[in-house]
Amino acid sequence: MKLRKPFRILRNLILFFFISSIGAVIFYRFVPVYVTPLMIIRSVQQLVSGEKVVCKHTWVPFDKISPSLPMAVIASEDNRFASHNGFDMIEIKKAMKENETRKKKRGASTISQQTAKNVFLWPQSSWIRKGFEVYFTFLIETCWSKERIMEVYLNSIEMGKGIYGAQATAKYKFKTTAAKLTRGQCALIAATLPNPIRFDSAHPSPYIKRRQGQILRLMNLVPKFPPVDKEKAKGQDTKKQKNKKKKK
């Protein structure tokens, strides 16, 4: 009897975790993500260190973000984003091979994995977090569209000290809106994503400027995102032609 109670508690905890995690993923399929664990952690760190707490974040829908920004982050972070199932096995194998001889290990996290980490987990790397990251990545790839994953990613990712998401970055770094970000500005933002605290997209270092140039070139090779629905586009063209005939 003594053994049954702990097992029952453990079973209930596991059941609660699965139900609540699936519920949270379904919830965020439709509802904007206004706060993330990283935002809270960074704010607490600032408070503890005696700094002024800065947390700039404004959610905007995907169609209010410059189309160049998803192209830039795909070119920089995850060029197979539109086609993989959340995990880029080609990059994972490359990273594993390179890490055999490298002191500084390189990762192979996809945009989907980064989104799962940003929205549901904590930033410190560990095998436990990686395990949860795989689980949540599978869930969002199953429950969300690629466009929704990108929308959440561009609205939640850290893009500067106390700055999160495309709209806040556009406002505080470039004095504009997310919709009006230029191609060059989007490439600068993408160039700083590996370390947005160290690198500043508004005042780029020579290294970031070189990365910007590389990303701009790669953007020409990346397929348009989100992919154009041929049937939908055909229907819109037909509608436009009919409207023109009516006007005549």
UniProtKB/Swiss-Prot annotation:
Q: Name one GO cellular component term.
A: peptidoglycan-based cell wall
Pathway the protein takes part in: Cell wall biogenesis; peptidoglycan biosynthesis
MF term (GO), any = peptidoglycan glycosyltransferase activity
Keyword annotations for this protein, in alphabetical order, are:
Cell inner membrane, Cell membrane, Cell shape, Cell wall biogenesis/degradation, Glycosyltransferase, Membrane, Peptidoglycan synthesis, Transferase, Transmembrane, Transmembrane helix
The primary location reported for this protein is membrane
Give the way it sits in the membrane.
Single-pass membrane protein
Which GO annotations describe the biological process of this protein? cell wall organization; peptidoglycan biosynthetic process; regulation of cell shape
**EC number(s) given by UniProt:** 2.4.99.28
Q: What's the top EC group for this one? A: transferase
Q: Where are the transmembrane segments?
A: 13-33
Task: Give the UniProt family note.
Answer: Belongs to the glycosyltransferase 51 family.
What does it do?
Peptidoglycan polymerase that catalyzes glycan chain elongation from lipid-linked precursors.
This one is known as Biosynthetic peptidoglycan transglycosylase
Native species of this protein?
A: Bacteroides fragilis (strain ATCC 25285 / DSM 2151 / CCUG 4856 / JCM 11019 / LMG 10263 / NCTC 9343 / Onslow / VPI 2553 / EN-2)
The upper taxonomy is:
Bacteria, Pseudomonadati, Bacteroidota, Bacteroidia, Bacteroidales
